[in-house]
Amino acid sequence: GLRQDEMEQLMAARGAGYETPESLMRRAGLSRPVLERLAAADAFGSMGLSRRSALWKVRGEAAGRTLPLFAAAGLAGQGSEAGVTLPLIPRSEEVIQDYQTARLSLKDHPMHFLREVHARRGIIPTREAAQSRNGRRVRTSGLVLVRQQPGTASGVVFITIEDETGIANLVVWPRVKERFRPVIMRARILHVRGRVQTADNVTHIVA
């Protein structure tokens, strides 16, 4: 992300907007590392640049600015490479990079790319699991949104997971938590087998 002062610089100099990463670097006075972070976060889409193309352009322009002797001789363009068309980044990789930089993605959900494999293994979407009949045993998987271990819950852990279809609420008993503690407490994606428990119109999957 950006520091507060970096964001203020960017906003103060934007005027009618920025046309290229170079104009952003020049007008806002942002450093190359800051522009690289913006490129990695796919922030240059409005300029018609993909994440990979933006990184390439930022690094190339920054390198060009470090040759004052050539610039003074009017030779700044000498030795520069011809335009390169970069291959598109696979959509799954784009989504992963979105999560690494912004903790979310508007392109797709990471679990979408596992759906075909999960279907073959009998792992159902969270929405289907949450709507299953009371007492049914299910297998589902999702990205961890929330972990809670209230002091009054006698060691029980409550976890909310999410996939591209919705969310499911998990109840993890102490014996299960102790058996799988590193996974339960730290994993970003959880696969769970449990029994559906519905009471007062609230559904949990009890692991």
Give each language-model segment a name.
Residues 116-154:
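Flexible, glycine/threonine-enriched loop-and-boundary segments that flank and lead into catalytic domains
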Residues 4-6, 137, 165, 189:
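Coil-to-beta-strand transition motifs
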Residues 140, 166-170, 203:
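Short beta-strand segments
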Residues 138, 142-144, 187-201:
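Flexible glycine-rich surface loops and low-complexity tracts that mediate binding to linear polymers
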Residues 176-192:
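Short nucleic-acid-contacting surface segments enriched for D/E, G, S/T with interspersed K/R
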Residues 1-131, 195-197, 206-207:
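Sliding clamp-binding short linear motifs
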Residues 150-175:
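OB-fold (S1/OB) nucleic-acid-binding surfaces
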